[in-house]
Swiss-Prot record:
Binding-site residues for substrate, renumbered to this chain: E88, G89, T90, Y119, R164, A165, R166, D186, G187, D188
GO molecular function: fructose 1,6-bisphosphate 1-phosphatase activity; metal ion binding; sedoheptulose-bisphosphatase activity
The keyword Nucleotidyltransferase is annotated on this UniProt entry: no
Enzyme Commission (EC) number: 3.1.3.11, 3.1.3.37
Protein name in the entry: D-fructose 1,6-bisphosphatase class 2/sedoheptulose 1,7-bisphosphatase
Record organism: Prochlorococcus marinus subsp. pastoris (strain CCMP1986 / NIES-2087 / MED4)
Catalytic activity: beta-D-fructose 1,6-bisphosphate + H2O = beta-D-fructose 6-phosphate + phosphate; D-sedoheptulose 1,7-bisphosphate + H2O = D-sedoheptulose 7-phosphate + phosphate
Subunit structure, as described in the record: Homotetramer.
UniProt-annotated binding residues for Mn(2+) 1: D33, E57
Amino acid sequence: MNQTLIQEILEVVEQAAIASAKLTGLGQKDEADAAAVEAMRLRMGKIEMKGKIVIGEGERDEAPMLYIGEEVGSGNGPGVDFAVDPCEGTNLCANNQRGSMAVLAASDTGGLFNAPDFYMNKLAAPPAAKGKVDIRNSATENLKILSNCLDLAIDELTVVVMDRARHKGLIKEIRECGAKIQPISDGDVQAAIACGFAGTGTHCLMGIGAAPEGVISAAAMRALGGHFQGQLVYDPAIAQTSEWADYTKEGNIKRLNEMGITDIDKIYEANELASGENVIFAGSGITDGLLFDGVKFEKDCTRTSSLVISTLDSTCRFTNTIHMKDGAKSISL
């Protein structure tokens, strides 16, 4: 992995965001996702690398592109593993709501946890709280610790939680402590990363979301120096999702064992979910969000707002790019 790869990966998420944004607000979530997938795959194919999708759009028989195990890139150069979500928050994009983005994590070969398509209990917090808050604690305990770490009163803290029935008890506990809740309907990657930046008004992410996106969040937080922990959820009674209506706890445990995951209750730290020597996170807004704006289409150009965090050079880059159209006559600042 090298510095050139950082710029190329930025362009990958930019192109995916632009493709998806053309369908923003049209109620076509599957089409928006497909457009992002195609654009991301096309740009990846131009990179000098031996790339491999380890977290993607599904198994080979479920997805035509960016499926798990697919090789991407020229086939020459460094080995790079990718966890991708070309249109994170497809519902958000379809309904023109905040928080949708094109996102990926990259690392050296073998450097990303091959998360199954399960759920994951997550805890994300700022760098000041790294190693101090713990997912094993109650929400009450973690809020007290976070309050001390950030030198803020508990009633000054805001916790992001997915708006799901399974979080009813968690939300009640957080509010009883005096902290504020910021509910989100979809897409917890941007919310997790926002915890790593002061001034976002977001101090913590708690609760259950998708496991693959947990790996992407972990990669970003590892590169940023923030706190992230995840624990796989395999009990349908805890996940409380219609997607698992026909699944059983015993069946899910068997699935995990077949994938080679025998310590099913293991709590993963960020550096275990993203363990490679080099880790890159890249995200580009499709719609406006906590960290950056969505795609803006103008007469002579298209504007993208993106974020790249890298351990390669210990940088965090917020990038605004103007993609000029042929024959552009006037570009405004």
